[in-house]
Structure formats: structure tokens, C-alpha cells
Amino acid sequence: MSDVQQEIDQLVKNNDIVLFMKGSASFPMCGFSGRAVQILKACGVDTKALTTVNVLENDGIRQGIKEYSNWPTIPQLYVRGEFIGGSDIMMEMYQSGELQQVIGGNAA
């Protein structure tokens, strides 16, 4: 496992909710990342409790997260070490109530 992969692995495993995105929760840099943050807020997640990783600040992470998850796009959500998906999957899961259940006790 490369250093970047190890760094990603530690972020995913050591934080309950991790969103790899473009920008930050307070200033998303793309519509999909912004939508992902809004979905999490709608689920009751306090953005202070949310770990976000701005992939625009680190090309290694930007490419590495795609390899780590075998998923080609950003944003990517992880809850308790499990890859959930991008903003489209998050929206589908939110609309069905499944995302709220997955997040569960982590909502603030």
C-alpha cells in the first residue's frame, strides 16, 4: 500500500464520517460536492463533526481516493469505514431513508 493509500485508509478508519470532496463543507468548489454536504446536513450531520478532505489541495489524494474505492468520481462518502458512494447515490439513499439509517447515531 502506498503512502497516499495509507493516509486515505487512516482517514477513513479513524473518522466516523468522511467526505472526500472538492472544496470544504463551508465552501464547496463543485455542485456535486455542495449537494453532498447539503444531503449530510439534511440527515442531521453537524458539519463540525464531519471530516472533509479537499482533494483539490492534494493531487495524490485526488487520484488515490479513486483507486482506494475503485470509484471514478468525487465526492465520495465513507461512514464508519464503509464506502457509501457519490452524491447521486447519497441522494437516492437519502430519499429512501437509508442514508439516515446508515449515519444513525453519528447525527448531531
Regions flagged by a language model, labelled:
Residues 9-47:
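Local sequence-structure signature of Cys/Sec-based thiol-disulfide redox active-site neighborhoods
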Residues 79-108:
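Non-catalytic, surface beta->alpha helical segment in thiol-disulfide oxidoreductase systems
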Residues 4-6:
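Eukaryotic intrinsically disordered and solvent-exposed regulatory patches
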Residues 45-62:
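Thiol-based oxidoreductase modules, predominantly thioredoxin-like and allied folds used
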Residues 67-73:
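Thiol/disulfide oxidoreductase modules built on the thioredoxin-like
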Residues 20-22, 53-58, 80:
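Structured beta-strand/turn binding interfaces of compact recognition modules in eukaryotic regulators
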